[in-house]
Amino acid sequence: VEIALTDGGTLSAAQVNDLSVAGTANCYVVSAPGTYVFNARVRGNGAGEGVGFEPAIEMADGMTADWLWTDSEGLVSGVALDTTSGDIFLTVGEGRGNALVALMQDGKVVWSWHVWVTDAPQTMTYGNGTVFMDRNLGAAGTTAGGTDAYGMYYQWGRKDPFYGGEKTETSANAFLEAKNGTVVN
């Protein structure tokens, strides 16, 4: 079966790994280079009462898909939408990091998904039975003190992560130094 994509390319269904086969989500973990697909007809996992939005997304003319940002050069490419199936396809290269992939209608973001490329996270069970991942959400590594262990930053009320940076600030006015050049200034 050949799949026609909005960027003009085609893919064979046998070449594609389905990220949403076990269910839809706002974040997908990818652990190896390859071509991937996920269901873009559902916002997040589509569940919940009173979430304030319609979970179903209807495909329409003018819809496209692309990546909005990545913290690792060349991490994702070939992002395309199949408007017939409502699936987004992307190719993940070598390396580790994060990307934000979006479904757009006439250039405006309809919904976005965090694609986290890392070796498969492991779980750790504490003495009291609490289970955690072995890394921060979005972290490329697990080395204590290493900048690849920082992960992503989240703001209350937002589902999409922000890039965590590659260094720490230790001076007394670290906040002021960290925000220089942002919209706040």
Question: For the regions a protein language model found, what residue spans apply to each?
Answer:
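Surface beta-loop-beta hairpin patches that serve as ligand-binding interfaces in beta-rich domains
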Residues: 1
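Short, compositionally biased
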Residues: 4-185
